[in-house]
Amino acid sequence: MRKYELMYIANPQLDPEKLKGLVANLSNVITSNGGSVLSLKEIGLKDLAYEINKHRKGYYVWMLVEASPEAIAEYKRVVNITESVIRNIEVKEGE
C-alpha cells in the first residue's frame, strides 16, 4: 500500500451536517476498500484563487491516506460524481 495526499474543495453553501456527511462518506470510500485514513484535516472555508463553478470560496479538506491504487481509483470515481465537490486532487507521497 502507498501513501497519498488527497485534497478536495466542497461547495461553500453546504450546511454543516451535509458537510460532515460528505467528509465521512469520502473517508469511508478509502476504508471500505482496504485503506486507512492516517490524518484528516478540515481546513475550513477559504477564498479561492479564481472562481470555480461560480463560487469564490470553498471548504477545504485534506487527508493523508494509505491505500492501494484500486482504492484511490474508486475514491476518484466517487469524488468526480459527487456534486458537492467542486475541485479535487490526489498526489502519491514522494512525487
Swiss-Prot record:
Keywords noted in UniProt: Ribonucleoprotein, Ribosomal protein, RNA-binding, rRNA-binding
GO biological process: translation
Gene Ontology molecular function: small ribosomal subunit rRNA binding; structural constituent of ribosome
InterPro entries: Ribosomal_bS6 (IPR000529), Ribosomal_bS6_CS (IPR020815), Ribosomal_bS6_sf (IPR035980), Ribosomal_S6_plastid/chlpt (IPR020814), Transl_elong_EF1B/ribsomal_bS6 (IPR014717)
Keyword Nucleotidyltransferase carried by entry: no
CDD domains reported for this sequence: bS6
Keyword Ribosomal protein (UniProt): yes
Cellular component GO terms, alphabetical: cytoplasm; ribonucleoprotein complex; ribosome
PROSITE patterns: RIBOSOMAL_S6
Biological role stated in the UniProt entry: Binds together with bS18 to 16S ribosomal RNA.
Stored NCBIfam families: S6
Family: Belongs to the bacterial ribosomal protein bS6 family.
Protein name, per record: Small ribosomal subunit protein bS6
